[in-house]
Structures are given as C-alpha cells and as structure tokens.
Amino acid sequence: MSPSPAERAEDLRRQIAQANRAYHELDAPEIPDVDYDRMVRELEALEREHPELARADSPTQQVGARPSGRFAEVRHAVPMLSLSNAFSDEEVADFVRRIDERLGRRSLQFSAEPKMDGLAISLRYEEGHFVLGATRGDGSTGEDVTANLREIGDIPKRLNGKDWPDVLEVRGEVYMARADFEAYNERARLQGGKVLANPRNAAAGSLRQLDPKISAQRKLSFFAYGTGEVQGGELPDTHSGTLAQLGSWGFPVSALCRVVDGTDGLLGYYRDIGERRDGLPFDIDGVVYKLDDRAGQQAMGFVSRAPRWAIAHKFPAQEQSTTVEAIEIQIGRTGAATPVARLAPVAVAGVIVSNATLHNADQIARLDVRVGDSVIVRRAGDVIPEVVSVILDRRPQGTTPWQMPTQCPVCGSEIVREEGAAAWRCSGELSCPAQRKEAIAHFASRRAMDIDGLGDKYIETLVDAGIVKGVADLYRLSRDQLLHLKLVLDAEDPSALAAALKLHLPAEGSGAVLNAVLKLDGNDPGWRAQALVQPASFEWNTKKIATKWADNLIAAIDASRAATLERLLFALGIEHVGESTAKALAQWFGDLELIRHLPWPLFKRVPDIGGEVARSLGHFFEQQGNQQAIDDLLQVGQVRISDAHAPSAKLREGLDLAQLLVESEIPGITRLRAEKLVAALPSAQAVLDAEHGQFVNAGLPDDTARGLAEWLDAEGHGAMLLAAEKAMRQILAKAPALAEIVAGPLDGQTVVLTGTLAQLTRDAAKERLEALGAKVSGSVSKKTSFVVAGTEAGSKLDKAQSLGVPVWDEDRLLAYLAEHE
C-alpha cells in the first residue's frame, strides 16, 4: 500500500534533515547530491499539490544552498611550479587573509581564471620566433615536444605586434575541446581505431607521440596563463596586464579571466564558473586565483614548490550512488593488496565507473562496506573513483562484513600484514605474476634502468607467455623474440597473426605453426600469450617488417647493463625507496653487496631514513626471491655497478654496539642505558647470553631489563643483532677514517643561486659549489653564507640585501671556482 501524501512528505523531510546534518554538521555526506536534489524536488512538488502540507520548517522553505622518456629532456630556466589547493570557502578566505597580513593591504585585487584540465607546457620564443616547447615534467625538467606543439594551430609560430622581449617563455595549457574529443572518438569508432578515454588523457597522449602527424590528427587547443623566463624586455606590472599583452602578441587567453576584489570577488567568480562549468566547451576542474600585481607576488614569494600568491580552488568531486556487486583485491608492484569494489556501472563526472578503490582493509572496516550495499562513489579530484560512504538505509537483509582473503588471488601465497601497517601484502614477492609485471615495468622505467621502448603491453604479454619471469630475463631477450612479439601484438585476431607469420616463416614446415595459431580462441584475453611460442626458425623479410624498434630496444637493454648504484636500487622497486632515498643509500654505503646484506637498523645511519623505511629495506633484502633476482641480474644479466665506492667516512660517527641497540628500537633502551649495558656486556653475543639479572646489574631498570629479555627471545631478533654487529665491523673496516676527510673550502656554508648565469647553467654551478662542500639552498635566510646573483635576479636578491647577506656576481663565482677547484 502506497503511503499517503502526508506520510511521504514527512518521510522526505526526515531523510532530507538527516542528509543535511550528515553533510553540514558531520562533514560526512550519506547520499550523493543527485539523490538529495531528487528528494527536495519531490517534496516541493508535494507541497505545491497539497498546500496544507507546507510548513515553515520544511527544507523547501529554508534559504541557502550548498556550493556546487621518449623525448629529449629540457631544463626549465624558471621552474614550472604547482599550486596549493583550496576546497572550501574558508580556505579561500584564509588564503586572502595570509596575503593581507603579509602585505598590510586592506584592498587586494586578484586575477581569476578557469583551471584547465589539460597538460601544462612551456613555450620559448627568441626574437619573436617559437624555438622550443616542453612539458612540465617534474617541474625542473620536462620533455621536448616542440615538433608536436608546432601542429597546434592556437600556438603562434611567430609573435604578432612588436616590443616583445628578446627571450620570452609563455606557460599555458594544451587541451582537447569536448567537441573535438567526441568527433575524434566517433571517427575512431567508425574506422575501428582506438577510442580515447577522456579529453585530458587525449591531450597528454597526443603530445607524447613520436610522430607529430598524430598530434595534428587529434585537434588540440591552447590557452596561455602566465610566463616563465623573460630577457631583454619588460612585461606589464600586473598579471591581468600580462595576459592582455600575451593576447596582443597572438596567444589565446581565456575570455573567462576576470579581475576581482577580495574574498567575496573570488567566491563570486568561483560560483559563476561552477554554474557554467557543464556548458563550457572544455573540461575544467576548478578555478585559479593569482594576486594581480607583480610587486605583491614578489613580496609574497614561494613556499615549497608553490607560490604563496596563487591557489587553485577545486570544484567538489562529483558523486553518484550505485551498488557493490563484489569486492576483490588487486596486487600491486610492491605486493600491496588493495581492495577494489566492483560496481553496477554508473555515470560519474562524465565517465562510466564500474570499479572504485576502497584503499585498504581498515577503510572497508571503517565504512563497513558489504557486497550488496548501496554506496556513494566519488571521483576524487575528478580522476580516481572511490567509495566514500554506505547508504545504510538501503542495506539489504543478509549481508555480512567483508574479510580480507587469506591467499593471494594471483599466486596463492599467504596475504600478511606487518605489525602497525595499514596495508596487507602478498608474501609471494617477485614470484607473484601480479607483482612481476608491475616490478618489471618499474625496473625498465625512465628514471630506473631507462629501457626505452619496453611498454606495458609488451611486458604483460612477455610475462603471460612465461618468457619473462623476472627482471633478469629482460637481458635474455633476442631480436627474433621481439619481432615475433610485435607481430603478435599488432594482430587483431589469430587469423591476422597467421597471415602475418606466413610472410616470415619458411614455406616448408610452417603448416603446423600456422594451424596452431588458427586454433586459438580470439575471444580469450590470453590468446596472444599463447601465440607467443617461438617457431624453430624465422626467415625475417625485412622489407615487410620494421626491425628498427627491436634493434633499438636491444640496444637500450644492453646500455642499461652499466648502471649507477642509485638507479639500480630505485629500479628494484623497494617499498618506500624513491629516487632521493636510493641516491642517499648509494652515497653513504657505495656498495651493492654491503647494502643487500645489511640488517635494517644500520640503514638508519643515513640521514632522513627512519624506522619505517629501514624496516622496508630490511624486509626486502631478507626475501630469498629478491636476493635471487639480484644474483640473476648480476650473473645472467651481467649488470654491473658503474660507480661503486667505499662507504662514507661519516658512517663512523657514533657507530658502536650501543648505537646498534638504540637503533634496533628495543623498548626502553636509550643511548645512556645502552652505554651502561655495553660497558658490562661488550659484544652482541654477550648480550644474547645474558639473563635478566645481568641486565639489572648493568644498570637497567627492572621493567627495561624484562623488555630487553623478551625482545631478544623474539624470533629473529638475536640473529639480527649478531648480523648487525658483524656488518658494523665491515663498515668500520671499509670506511675511510674521519681524519682522512678533506674539508672543502665551503664546508658548512649555505649558498643561494638566483637569476641567469651567462657562462654556467644553474645545475653546473650547483654541482661545482657542492663539490667544494657547500649546501646549495633554494631560499635566502639569515643563515645564508652568500648569494650568487645573475641577470634578472628577483626577490631572492632583494631579500639578501635586506638581510645583509653577501652577494657575489658571476665573475666572482668563476674566479673563486678557478682558484679552489
């Protein structure tokens, strides 16, 4: 029996009130906006049809609404910085307040503009001619995509007008308009080609094509939003004026840019653009606010990798409700078992979402997500779908809490979780095929071993076929295998592959191979791996198959055999070990054999390596499978370390058994207590052989003595302490004496570089200063020893002068380097 209008209205008011409280008071929305709006509209209709149901406290009467490596590297003369984000009105108000307090102004003007969802690039013009275009990259170094950028009609090849600077770098966003995106995909569908995922990926992928003709086919657009390096000329003293000037020189500038006053102006602009967002011809994911006057920008300066005078105000992530059909786990490169919700497909933020991350088991427990639940799915940052909450009112009867599986779904190994860790992991290490694919892809990546040309699809097929079972197998690949692989991957189905193979197999004896290929099921996702079975011989017809790709890949594999220690350590894919940590390990220990057999507490000798990273390193090297993989690399792959050296003498500082006990994180063991213990028990073996009473006699409190005894009794701790003592002796034997360290003339001094140097690149100057012992910093303070100022020096020079920090010009720097190097 259907409820009466009065009953339905009351039920709607209850649900809306509950949703309002969850959203506004608890900051934990239980339903997506689309469901909330639907309920409000239904209640409005009921109150119109039945005026007697209208009440003063009805939600419909309340005022207010919620706010809606294949390219050459290019070193950016001026870094392409990122922006801090604001997600609320309060954060925007705080941004304005910080500027007001720092500058002491009561009236602030800002330039506001849409935040394009594309790819940031830098365009360099010399004497008015476009000479170089680069991607953002890591902010300091990007990729040279000049040829592809020349295919974009919006980008002027020569500047209009006059009075442009001798050197002008223009920063902006390459994007694909929605209409062009839809048109391209429609053509691709009709022609049986590849359909692009979304406009942002389309723009990024197009610019990274080796063939500029592909960029031309995928019609791209451009908006300018700022400048980088400027030499031999001046720009207007406001950001808005600079944009207008860029427009006069031929650069497209968004017609949605506005100059607004204060917080109210910013929020008004934000809401205006938010309301127009869906009707715009391009995708945006927020708006950007910049202090308009350059003098104020210079006074505000920068923090970390972002300016203090600008911020991105992101739109709320779009949400929708759907049903959880299953919860599965995916195994990542480092073995992390990540739960993934398989969803009834739903459109969210313009794309169909059928999977969403649940992050980890603790998150599932916190949300209590169950199979069969109705959930809210959000595309966080408009990119990554995630389950944010469960709609408990819709939970069906009979659901049960989800439990983490005990075995890896890929290799069957046990799934374990380290004490205190959030993530569960497959214990199969590199023997797990799921980890193997990701590990090999990471190993071959540009910043690791830099095996250019070995893409994910090649790795996946090689692993599935059993040809590559570990990273060392990459060094066994032959030219014939790679050419065969290319044929298999290029073929749309087994029939097409058989036709291609027929051109290259000898006429006699090829029938069995071709028949085997034709029997493969093209609907089976693994048919390509099954087809990758090397025939007895190939007679490659080089007129009909391109061999350059295979030759280049073999050359890249061979070149990677000579690796720096930091590259190899990073390439191993050890959890928590990024490039900077790998570099530090290489600098401090210098030797792979030492590192791979080092107990984890000794890794903490390296500055900035704490217990979590040290334990991760120890765990990795404790696994026999990982040690075997390293052995295979050295023996089968013939990989060699090109820059091995003795451990740093600085490792000697304070390195003794007492420090080992402290760094082993034994409960209650401080440096003072460890020294007392070692004075009575001077070796690791003596500590292991001692009993509780001896620990007390050595000066330990009773509870600490009991804790030490329990720690030593725990599995593996005693062996680890003995191994750590042995490794400590090896380090002390190999490391130079501290007295042998020759202090550089700039040891202990901090130097800041600013402006453009004529005879040195900034990287070269930094390297030479560091070689003399200096620390090169990015910011000026009272502790700065001196500042080297080139041309176009900016706020750093001003700050140095205000603080009385000595300033050197380039000539003085060059003279000093010549004298002391």
From Swiss-Prot:
Top EC category: ligase
Superkingdom of source: Bacteria
Start and end residues of each BRCT domain: 741-821
Active site, UniProt feature: K115 (n6-amp-lysine intermediate)
Cofactors (names): Mg(2+); Mn(2+)
GO molecular function terms noted in the UniProt entry: DNA ligase (NAD+) activity; metal ion binding
Catalytic activity: NAD(+) + (deoxyribonucleotide)n-3'-hydroxyl + 5'-phospho-(deoxyribonucleotide)m = (deoxyribonucleotide)n+m + AMP + beta-nicotinamide D-nucleotide
One of the GO BP terms on file: DNA replication
InterPro entries referenced in this protein's UniProt entry, alphabetically: BRCT_dom (IPR001357), BRCT_dom_sf (IPR036420), DisA/LigA_HHH (IPR041663), DNA_ligase (IPR001679), DNA_ligase_AS (IPR018239), DNAligase_adenylation (IPR013839), DNAligase_N (IPR013840), NA-bd_OB-fold (IPR012340)
Entry GO terms, CC: cytosol
Signal peptide (residue range): none
Binding-site list for Zn(2+): C408, C411, C426, C432
Keywords, in A-Z order: DNA damage, DNA repair, DNA replication, Ligase, Magnesium, Manganese, Metal-binding, NAD, Zinc
The keyword rRNA-binding appears for this protein: no
E.C. designation(s): 6.5.1.2
Entry keyword Hydrolase: no
One Pfam family recorded for the sequence: DNA_ligase_aden
HAMAP family in the cross-refs: DNA_ligase_A (MF_01588)
Biological role stated in the UniProt entry: DNA ligase that catalyzes the formation of phosphodiester linkages between 5'-phosphoryl and 3'-hydroxyl groups in double-stranded DNA using NAD as a coenzyme and as the energy source for the reaction. It is essential for DNA replication and repair of damaged DNA.
UniProt family annotation: Belongs to the NAD-dependent DNA ligase family. LigA subfamily.
Name of the protein: DNA ligase
Organism field: Stenotrophomonas maltophilia (strain R551-3)
Organism classification: Bacteria, Pseudomonadati, Pseudomonadota, Gammaproteobacteria, Lysobacterales
Name of the coding gene: ligA
